[in-house]
Amino acid sequence: MNTNQVTAVAFLVAGAIGTARAQQATFSSRIDAVRVDVLVTDANGPIRDLGRSDFEIRDNGVLQQIDLVSFEQIPLNVVLALDMSDSVAGDRLDRLRAAGTAILGGLQSGDQAALVTFSHVVRLAAKLSPDIRSVRTALARASGDGSTSLVDGAFMGMQVGASDAGRELLIVFSDGLDTASWLSADKVLDVAKRSDAVAYAVAVRSRAKPEFLRDLASFTGGRLFEVEKTERLDSVFLQILQEFRQRYLISYTPRDVMKEGWHKLDVRVKRGGTVKARPGYQS
């Protein structure tokens, strides 16, 4: 078995353990409380003055009592999961580094960040930490080579950002299709349904459709950005951060619903507006 295979196998074993722990923790938290990040917009942009009485949330069709609606600047756990395959080189790599540096520069006191890179292997380049400088240094040292383990990279990103404190924002960038992952897309999407992370995906537009990234963003209440080129990648990353900070955090304790299985969520605003939130969660 070569070095790359050993690395991949070790990652899978560690990932399987991490998944079991994450699912167990998520299941227990679902019994106590469910947290839902919600973006509400109108023709003028995000609506910022809503309170608890303005929202309705249904869990599997059952109207729930909302315990808390917060629009505070709750600290963020931001994980960058970046494609470093051999197609990300030269100017494209420089622009990706600049975009990552821009979003790290937009973080505030109390926020944490981490960096995951993926090519033919997945690397935790910088663990989740309030030391943003160390993440910036790891980003500056990152380089591209090999094929693309997109699904594996997204999986590790969700594991790295999981925390009882802070709101979890996962940003996944890729310029191509997955060619080297060991984990299946369905498996990782199932983990996403159990996660509190909101995933935003950035894909370079090509003939191949980024279905995995689209599903990942959809299941977590995030958004997919498809870009023609990478010249303005930094503005896209900053737009993601700004949009995420405009979200409300809704918390409720499920009542009169089955605790196991898929829970369909329906979030509405009584006074109007377009609502974006995860479609449900798996417990």
Predicted regions and their residues:
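Bacterial N-terminal signal peptides
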Residues: 7-16
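Small side chains
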Residues: 15-18, 113
